[in-house]
Amino acid sequence: SEMCIRDRNMTIQEAQKIIDNWIKEKGVRYFNELTNTTILMEEVGELARIVSRKYGEQSFKEGEKDLDLADEIADVMWVLICIANQTGVDLTEALKKNIDKKNSRDSRRHLDNKKLR
C-alpha cells in the first residue's frame, strides 16, 4: 500500500492510519506527547527558515538553496498527525468542527476588517 498511495488522493483519515501503521511497524512506538510537541516546534522552525529565506528579507545560506518547502510542510503534518493519533484526535472530524466554527464565529470578521482593504 505504500507504493500505490502516490497514485491517488489520500484522505486525512487514511494519512492518520498510514502514519500509525508506520510508527508501529518501523518506529517501534510513538515518542511521548511532550517530545512530539517539541519535535513539532523544531519542524515548524525549519519551515519558517525556508519561508523567511524564500519570501522574506533573509537570503539563503550556502547549501540551503535546495531546501524543499513542500517537504518541510509534510514534516510538520507528519508530527501533527502523530500527536493527533496518540491523543485520540480524529483530524477529519476536528477540522470539520473547526471549519464550522470559523464559518459561524468568523464569517464576517475579515470582510469587515478595514486593515485588510
Located regions from the model:
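Flexible "arm" and connector segments at domain edges
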Residues: 9-73, 77-117
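Short, small-residue-biased leader/transition segments that mark boundaries at the very start
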Residues: 1-5
